[in-house]
């Protein structure tokens, strides 16, 4: 972690400052191309080189990510997962004259309650506490309580006279985007999805599971069409929805879970398409029993028949402060627990226990049946062997963990089951003899302990009396994150998984010190799983393909199960998304779309000049070699989180909209309210402004 080693940071964010060193107040996730950009652009034609595939005509690629409204203080608590949601998209419009495809760039803030409140008040810093504040071991109980009560105070203030935008939901909608049943939705786990309009990326309103704000009222709603949350004092928490909902490409159902601080902690919902309301198919806020506590739960697995909830030992619990722990805390003495249940029967959950880990993203989930008829549910996920990323993405030095390899026994008294596992500090490493050290130095701070690898789990459902993890090992030794598959192969046994990697470090550390993605990977998961089973890979610590990034790049065999596209020097990519070629018969026949930034544009200080721009690259996903087109954008796109491809049919099939959210309308209403109320209202607004400035 070079940044952490070479720079003294603030006492609250890093370590004790050296008395002779003046610490540079620069946060790696607020500088360079991580720095937010505040210019928004309506649909603007772009130039391009190469040939744009006809499959893209009429569609749009959109990527979501955190983009803080203000970041003047580069030394303050900040985390890569913080920030107001901003969408950046490229639409491919067909010209009416010559029929050519014209790419058009657009980017817009998502107008959440927090964003609108922040822009129409005198509040100087984010309304919500930073994740950094919650995970920092040096954060005192007073600091956390102050940040929490400050948020509560500002939420209450936003509901008093003079506010034209009350804060009813605390989501920044900065995580991902998806399409379901005529709606494009932006997500974040601190609130419900937010509907956006394509291709303009305007904000429509919050989606509550039945309808979105800004849509025409539903004339007839079914008796079971209840919204997220239901009723009760804690109903607002049951609106909090995963940042990664899953849409079944066959049935059109959208699967979601809602994660809260209160038992039973997790609820699940299944929303069918509006024209397919078979009895029993719609579920809203159904409890998943057996979750061990409040968890930082970012993703889940979903096959055509089953859902997998991950109860990992990474807690997100305000009550931790009473126990002398951080609100977000990782406990490597506890196991990882995977709850598997039929899609529409969460009450039938079965819990599988194994070694502790962190998983932020799943790649794919599918059902399989042996020749004897035994049923298994399979999961591919990006498995981290530590919680390092949670800390380093906030520029915090991770807690030191002793390396332990003794066997532990953990029991769940509620279920009267026991889980015995070897607490391995890492997945099995190929070690220096295979050349891995060329890219991943084996040091105290950067070794297998911090690796993130594409990992295979097989949950055996054949024996009702025993919950057994039949297989669990890594497919490859290389770092692998931000996974995706061909959309119409999701929830089935997809052969290929696409994702990101890095040639300079490992993801657990690299993302934290703001290293970037310079490799895109295509992994033949089906072949690697078959090899793993044939070689009887070691449970938990096994690794099927032990080659390093360097070795794979040197070999580049035609039949290699791992193909890597390496970007040119100083060029860095973001998460790729697959678009299939028309009438394709082979699973990998299509294109990968992703944003690219050339860091040779950076100033000597490491900052981006105003003239810096990004590109959208279109890569042949079959040979992972040919860049068929590059779209030159009018501005840069900061490194962000997740994107998706919206087809022309998606855009044309959007539900009607009556109204859109607008910052200008909110500002105008505020001015009209003040000017129409005489001196009393003006005096109140003066007092209100002082209160806002007083709390920052």
UniProtKB/Swiss-Prot annotation:
Its EC number is 1.13.11.63. Residues 1-16 have a biased composition (Polar residues). The keyword Metal-binding applies. Disruption phenotype: Does not impede neurosporaxanthin biosynthesis and shows a significant increase in the total carotenoid content. Leads to increased expression of carAR and carO, but not carB. Keywords: Carotenoid biosynthesis, Dioxygenase, Iron, Metal-binding, Oxidoreductase. Residues 1-27 are annotated as: Disordered. Binds 1 Fe(2+) ion per subunit. Pathway: Carotenoid biosynthesis. Induction: The expression is subject to photoinduction. It catalyses: all-trans-beta-carotene + O2 = 2 all-trans-retinal. It comes from the Eukaryota. Its cofactor is Fe(2+). Carotenoid dioxygenase; part of the car gene cluster that mediates the biosynthesis of neurosporaxanthin, a carboxylic apocarotenoid acting as an essential protective pigments and leading to orange pigmentation. CarX mediates the cleavage of beta-carotene produced by carAR into retinal, the rhodopsin's chromophore that is involved in the regulation of the carotenoid biosynthetic pathway via a negative feedback mechanism. This is Carotenoid dioxygenase carX. The lineage of its organism: Eukaryota, Fungi, Dikarya, Ascomycota, Pezizomycotina.
């Amino acid at each position: 972690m070079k940044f952490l080693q070479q720079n003294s940071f603030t006492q609250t964010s890093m370590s004790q400052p050296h008395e002779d060193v003046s610490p540079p107040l620069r946060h790696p996730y607020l500088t360079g191309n991580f720095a937010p950009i505040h210019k928004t652009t309506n649909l603007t034609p772009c130039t391009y080189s190469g040939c744009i595939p006809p499959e893209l005509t009429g569609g749009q690629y959109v990527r979501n990510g955190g983009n803080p409204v203000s970041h003047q203080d580069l030394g303050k608590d900040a985390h890569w997962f913080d920030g107001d949601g901003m969408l950046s998209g490229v639409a491919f419009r067909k010209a009416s004259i010559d029929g050519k495809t014209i790419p058009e760039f657009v980017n817009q803030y998502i107008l959440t309650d927090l964003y609108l409140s922040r822009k129409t008040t005198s509040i100087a810093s984010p309304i919500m506490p930073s994740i950094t504040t919650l995970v920092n071991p040096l954060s005192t109980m007073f600091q956390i309580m102050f940040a929490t009560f400050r948020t509560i105070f500002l939420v209450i203030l936003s509901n008093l006279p003079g506010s034209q935008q009350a804060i009813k939901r605390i989501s920044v909608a900065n995580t991902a985007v998806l399409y379901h049943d005529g709606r494009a939705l932006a997500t974040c786990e601190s609130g419900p999805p937010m509907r956006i309009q394509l291709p303009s990326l305007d904000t429509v309103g919050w989606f509550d599971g039945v309808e979105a704000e800004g849509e025409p009222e539903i004339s007839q709603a079914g008796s079971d069409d209840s919204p997220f949350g239901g009723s009760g004092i804690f109903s607002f928490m049951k609106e909090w929805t995963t940042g990664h909902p899953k849409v079944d490409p066959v049935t059109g159902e959208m699967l979601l879970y809602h994660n809260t601080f209160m038992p039973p902690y997790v609820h699940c919902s299944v929303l069918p398409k509006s024209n397919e309301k078979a009895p029993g198919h719609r579920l809203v806020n159904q409890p998943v029993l057996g979750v061990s506590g409040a968890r930082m739960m970012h993703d889940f697995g979903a096959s055509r028949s089953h859902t997998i909830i991950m109860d990992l030992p990474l807690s997100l619990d305000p009550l931790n402060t009473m126990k002398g722990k951080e609100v977000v805390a990782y406990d490597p003495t506890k196991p990882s627990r995977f709850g598997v249940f039929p899609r529409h029967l969460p009450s039938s959950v079965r819990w599988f226990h194994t070694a502790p880990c962190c998983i932020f993203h799943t790649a794919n989930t599918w059902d399989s049946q042996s020749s004897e008829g035994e049923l298994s549910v399979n999961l591919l996920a990006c498995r981290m062997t530590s919680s390092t990323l949670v800390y380093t993405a906030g520029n915090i030095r991770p807690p030191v963990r002793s390396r332990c390899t003794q066997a532990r026994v953990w029991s769940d008294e509620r279920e009267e089951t026991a889980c015995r596992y070897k607490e391995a500090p890492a997945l099995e490493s190929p070690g220096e003899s295979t050349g891995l050290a060329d890219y991943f130095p084996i040091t105290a701070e950067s070794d297998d302990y911090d690796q993130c690898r594409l990992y295979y789990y097989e949950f055996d459902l054949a024996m009702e009396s025993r919950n057994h993890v039949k297989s669990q090992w890594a497919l490859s030794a290389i770092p692998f994150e931000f996974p995706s598959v061909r959309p119409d192969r999701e929830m089935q046994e997809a052969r290929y998984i696409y994702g990101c990697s890095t040639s300079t470090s490992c993801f657990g550390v690299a993302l934290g010190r703001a290293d970037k993605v310079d490799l895109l990977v295509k992994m033949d998961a089906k072949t690697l799983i078959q090899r793993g089973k044939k070689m009887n890979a070691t449970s938990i610590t096994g690794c099927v393909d032990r080659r390093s990034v360097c070795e794979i790049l040197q070999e580049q065999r035609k039949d290699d199960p791992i193909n890597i596209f390496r970007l040119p020097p100083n060029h860095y990519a973001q998460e790729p998304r697959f678009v299939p070629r028309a009438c394709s018969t082979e699973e990998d026949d299509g294109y990968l779309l992703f944003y690219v930034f050339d860091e040779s544009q950076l100033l000597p200080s490491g900052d981006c000049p105003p003239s810096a721009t990004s590109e959208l690259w279109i890569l042949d996903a079959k040979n992972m070699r040919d860049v068929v087109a590059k779209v030159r954008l009018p501005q840069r796109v900061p490194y962000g989180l997740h994107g998706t491809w919206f087809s022309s049919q998606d855009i044309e099939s959007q539900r009607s909209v009556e109204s859109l959210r607008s910052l200008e309308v909110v500002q105008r209403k505020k001015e009209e309210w003040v000017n129409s109320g005489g001196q009393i209202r003006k005096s109140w607004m003066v007092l209100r402004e002082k209160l806002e400035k007083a709390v920052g």
